[in-house]
Amino acid sequence: MGPRYEKRGVKMNRKVTVVGGAGNVGATVARSIAEKELADVVIVDIADQKAAGVALDILETCPIVGSDSLVIGGSDYSQSANSDVVVVTSGVPRKPGMSRDDLLNVNFNIMKAVTEQVVKYSPNCIIVPVANPLDAMCQAVYKLSGFPRERVIGMAGVLDSARMRTFIALELSVSVENVHAFVLGGHGDTMVPLPRLSTVAGIPITQLLSKERIDAICKRTADGGAEITKLVGTSAWYAPGESAAEMVEAILKDKKKILPCSAYLEGEYGVKGQFLGVPVKLGANGIEQIIEIRLEADEQAALDKSAAAVKELIDVIKM
């Protein structure tokens, strides 16, 4: 167990735990939350000393950015007790020679072990899974935790939509702040970008870009993770980490913010009994509303295809 760092006379009311926080994505989540002073942060990782070191490094940024958040790290889950939100970034990437089923089962076993500890120490928390394959891992956490569906929320659509917004802004040479875009469906090849509902300062992009350019943007969005992996040699971490942090901020500040997230559906969008990326309202209670958009026939067909692909993954882990 790494060293603890106590603050003098300062008590934060919020606590966020990042499991797998010594890794790139987890450390980015932890740093963002601490630097914004959203909560105290606990980094839990099987790499005990690394977790303590990452926590100390982030803690030492706090005087520079003007944050009084406490950041501690280690392998002991007891530090995470009574967390408001637990972000789970634990998981292994697919390695050469590893089948999809092998990857699923390895990460399922990791999620099982993590979920048991999270439920033990923070039975009232909201869990935000980040590990891939995202929607299947959400299903595992939901079933294993016994939590209501409002309190298990997967990070996927925020990242995919951010990528789409980036590519639209680059194409039109406009501020990304003017760009709004939604990507629904599973976090993978079958994701469903919705250009019809994507806008720049309220103007539909269908009025600003040709179909060919829009199709190219949608394809680049779907390939966004692979593009970075090809360039860097490993998975992205800054954008995924900030995406999870945005969700945590919406929850802790009770923002009632509408974001695309992986949610357990009970008939919405014609999907029942599984996780899928849809627009949700995030607030203090987690998912406070699932927003149902009227989809065109081709959009619904694409979403159905995406749901079917996610179900295939879920069936592998028998959840």
Regions found by a protein language model. Give the residues of each.
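N-terminal Rossmann-fold NAD(P) dinucleotide-binding loop
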Residues: 26-27
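Short, Lys/Arg-enriched N-terminal segments with co-localized hydrophobic residues
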Residues: 1-11
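Hydrophobic Val/Ile/Leu positions in short beta-strands of Rossmann-like dinucleotide-binding domains
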Residues: 18-19, 43
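C-terminal substrate-binding/catalytic lobe of Rossmann-fold NAD(P)-dependent dehydrogenases
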Residues: 145-151, 159-319
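Conserved glycine-rich cofactor-binding loop
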Residues: 22
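Rossmann-like NAD(P)-binding element
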Residues: 63-125
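Conserved N-terminal Rossmann-fold NAD(P) cofactor-binding segment
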Residues: 13, 40, 44-83, 311-319
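Rossmann-like NAD(P)(H) cofactor-binding subdomain of soluble oxidoreductases
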Residues: 99-165
